[in-house]
Amino acid sequence: MNVTLLIPARYGSSRFPGKPLAPINGKPMIQHVYERAALAKGLTAIYVATDDLRIKEAVEAFGGKVVMTDANAASGTDRIEDAITQLGLADDDLVINLQGDQPLIDPISIEQIITLFERHPGEFGMATLGYEITEEHELNDPKHVKMVFDNQFNALYFSRARIPFGRDTDDYPVYKHLGVYAYTREFVRTFNKLPLGRLEDLEKLEQLRALEHGHTIKVAISAFDSPEVDTPEDIRICEARLAVD
């Protein structure tokens, strides 16, 4: 099975312009993401998908591969579709979508999501990662997307609110969504033809589109958190963790 990992990266960000190139311990953030992903077993190729020449030059400077995408891509999945088309991937090829602001991604987590497709070929077209929340402040923070899943680890819902709600107790596990996706090339094509979902639009969570239209999202629970860098203040947290990693 061919497995291509794509790292979509945009230069523009309202909260943190130039985020992919922000230095973390002497390297641009996108380099940390790329190099940690490269440690995962089972990958055929890794590309950064971007529409910005500054990011392209930075990636090529450390020896990474880049595919230039349409600057007018409406969403992250549209950018992935553009990259897949340019790379000429086959319908049954596996595509991993790793966000460019996850410099702490653990390669074992990437291997987990590949294993899901190896063990259950043809049973689903999309999978993602979850992590049991250990920091209390994340429980009610809408920045941290929560998720629930059934006994077969099929996603039931994603929300910015705390789910599930414990009517009589607060002592129960709550899982957050880690922004890593895997799908077959064929499913990406299917997904991009689906109309915007009502819940997707309400929560501003693109993955809800798949659930709203009856598609299965398989979940793997990671033993490793992968916090995203959303603000310059998050850089200090990453630097401290990378220093001891």
UniProtKB/Swiss-Prot annotation:
In the record, the note on similarity to other proteins reads: Belongs to the KdsB family.
Q: Molecular function (GO) terms listed?
A: 3-deoxy-manno-octulosonate cytidylyltransferase activity
The pathway it acts in is: Bacterial outer membrane biogenesis; lipopolysaccharide biosynthesis
Q: Name one GO cellular component term.
A: cytosol
EC class, as a word, reads transferase
The subcellular location is: Cytoplasm
The record ties this protein, via Gene3D superfamilies, to: Spore Coat Polysaccharide Biosynthesis Protein SpsA, Chain A
Q: Which gene encodes it?
A: kdsB
- Reaction equation(s) it catalyzes: 8-amino-3,8-dideoxy-alpha-D-manno-octulosonate + CTP = CMP-8-amino-3,8-dideoxy-alpha-D-manno-oct-2-ulosonate + diphosphate
Its main subcellular localisation, reduced to a broad class, is: cytoplasm
What is the protein name stated in its UniProt record? 8-amino-3,8-dideoxy-manno-octulosonate cytidylyltransferase
What PANTHER family does the database record attribute to this sequence? 3-DEOXY-MANNO-OCTULOSONATE CYTIDYLYLTRANSFERASE (PTHR42866), 3-DEOXY-MANNO-OCTULOSONATE CYTIDYLYLTRANSFERASE, MITOCHONDRIAL (PTHR42866:SF2)
Q: Which residues form a coiled coil?
A: none
An annotated GO BP: lipopolysaccharide biosynthetic process
Q: Which UniProt keywords apply?
A: Cytoplasm, Lipopolysaccharide biosynthesis, Nucleotidyltransferase, Transferase
Q: What is the lineage of its organism?
A: Bacteria, Pseudomonadati, Pseudomonadota, Gammaproteobacteria, Alteromonadales
UniProt EC number: 2.7.7.90
In terms of superkingdom, the source organism counts as Bacteria
Role noted for this protein: Activates KDO8N (a required 8-carbon sugar) for incorporation into bacterial lipopolysaccharide in the Shewanella genus.
